[in-house]
């Protein structure tokens, strides 16, 4: 909560200082808002004196946590110059964006501040991005895509976060094919691997029933984030979808050895895969171990499954013992018969 509050505060401070007579720190000045080839910085516009005084008063009210007062002061400003109008709308939109329930109005003001294209380049670029972020937050996904693209076109910056959020907007729009390109760009641009674009990409293929491609992305996730157990499990399940039982077994076996398989149904899946891959002894052993440690319920059916696998592995004495346990729990004559045969 504190981090969120500080971030929102910084938005308002930035909105006030940019375009006002207050100087920014050298570090902020040195960061070019636009990196397009041949870009030349234009003349810096400053808000007019009359409007500036009222904006200063609103900012002081905001700093004293008199948010509603700040909003009232800014709302009453009747700016005449295009830059002053855009500047006030931007500042007011930034403040409203920090208040719950005022997202739509904030968006309206922020959009109006960039549509005229009179803000200074840094203000314009930051506002394009803020409009996109707020649109995503307000579930205005088409508008989010529009303004993320506008930000990229205006700045020529390659921002992995922007590409990830754009991919997310495409996902929410169910335009699954369109999210692949921004997701790939995000993956390539992140200095430290970020799971989000991988997951969006995987979801895109999965939703379109492109299961081989889904497996490919899942393999990338496991290789990039090997410590996250759930992805090993999901990769094993995805292999089953393309009927690659050997890779499914190998993957789930690693997951089991690393302690990633905890749910009974997943342990049973591993046991069944051993059986499918002609490894009945391992099938029986993994099931028996987890019945013994309580992860799998001790029922007649589960005991019979252990017995069947030991039977197939020609471990007749052990199989007979498990058939006996199954028979005692269920009084099923079939289990007694199988025990007798052995």
Predicted feature locations:
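Structural motif corresponding to the intra-repeat A-B loop/turn of tetratricopeptide repeats
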Residues: 64, 99-100, 138, 173, ...
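TPR-repeat structural position
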Residues: 67, 102-103, 141, 176, ...
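Generic helix N-cap/helix-start motif at coil->alpha-helix transitions
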Residues: 46-55, 83-89, 120-129, 155-165, ...
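N-terminal leader/linker segments that initiate helical-solenoid repeat arrays
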Residues: 2-126, 137, 146, 172
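Solenoidal tandem-repeat scaffolds enriched in leucines and small polar residues
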Residues: 153-258, 262
């Amino acid at each position: 909560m504190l981090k969120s509050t500080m971030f929102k505060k910084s938005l308002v401070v930035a909105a006030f200082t940019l375009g006002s007579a207050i100087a920014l720190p050298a570090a902020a000045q040195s960061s070019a808002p636009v990196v397009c080839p041949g870009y030349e910085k234009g003349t810096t516009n400053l808000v007019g004196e009359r409007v500036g005084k009222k904006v200063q008063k609103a900012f002081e009210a905001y700093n004293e946590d008199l948010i509603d007062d700040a909003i009232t002061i800014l709302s009453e400003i009747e700016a005449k110059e295009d830059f002053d109008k855009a500047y006030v709308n931007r500042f007011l939109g930034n403040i409203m964006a920090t208040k719950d329930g005022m997202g739509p109005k904030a968006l309206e003001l922020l959009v109006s501040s960039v549509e005229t294209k009179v803000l200074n380049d840094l203000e314009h670029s930051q506002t394009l991005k803020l409009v996109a972020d707020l649109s995503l937050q307000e579930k205005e996904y088409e508008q989010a895509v529009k303004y993320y693209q506008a930000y990229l076109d205006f700045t020529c910056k390659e921002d992995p976060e922007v590409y990830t959020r754009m991919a997310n907007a495409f996902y929410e729009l169910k335009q699954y094919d369109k999210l692949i390109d921004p997701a790939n760009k995000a993956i390539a641009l992140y200095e430290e691997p970020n799971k989000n674009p991988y997951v969006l990409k995987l979801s895109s293929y999965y939703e379109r029933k492109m299961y081989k491609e889904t497996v490919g992305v899942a393999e990338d996730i496991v290789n990039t984030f090997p410590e996250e157990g759930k992805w090993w499990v999901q990769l094993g399940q995805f292999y089953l979808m393309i009927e690659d039982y050997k890779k499914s077994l190998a993957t789930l076996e690693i997951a089991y050895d690393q302690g990633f398989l905890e749910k009974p149904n997943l342990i049973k899946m591993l046991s069944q895969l051993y059986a499918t891959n002609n490894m009945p002894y391992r099938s029986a052993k993994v099931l028996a171990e987890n019945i013994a440690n309580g992860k799998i319920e001790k029922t007649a059916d589960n005991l019979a499954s252990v017995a069947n696998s030991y039977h197939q592995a020609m471990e007749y004495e052990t199989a007979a013992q498990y058939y006996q346990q199954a028979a005692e729990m269920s009084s099923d004559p079939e289990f007694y018969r199988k025990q007798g045969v052995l």
